[in-house]
Amino acid sequence: FVVTLLLNALLGNAALAQGVLVAPTPPPAQDILTRAASSVGVKRCLPAISRLSGMTVQGARSHDVLLDWDRKQPDDGPVFSLIGLEYTNAGVAASITAIPESGGACTVSAERISVAPYTCASIAQQELVGYQMTKLLPIFSVYTDPKEPNSSVSLIDSPPGCLVIR
């Protein structure tokens, strides 16, 4: 009891109430595309690039990026990227392109490219019900959803599987 009173007098009650200090959890590492775009001077489209890239690399074991940009005007020119993604059982590629517009806005395009071990016809039947199909070539079909006119899914027959571009 005397020790407790002495500690209270010397250190205050807060010292007795403190638990073991735990180091704060570091924030998740920034994805490579966001770091690369930022390092070359891209600012205006960086929030859109970062948001899309973060969603793209989520769940990947590792990823790397190929980046092309306007070296004379990095913040005013287009940014093109190709991202390679490694998953436990598959490899995927993604492309993110950002083009600054007047007034500070950005036009952004994103695609995910993968190979499915199924026929393109079976993917269309299971995943693209209600989509409209446009056949570009006998092996290449583009599907659009009337509810999302700015989005498409391309299926390219590549036996024994299907190349899928979303």
Residue map of PLM features:
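Short, surface-exposed beta-strand/loop micro-motifs that present aromatic residues
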Residues: 95-99, 151-156
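Short, flexible domain-boundary/linker segments around small modular repeats
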Residues: 136, 141-148
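Short, exposed beta-strand-loop hairpins at the edges of beta-sheets
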Residues: 143, 152-161, 165-166
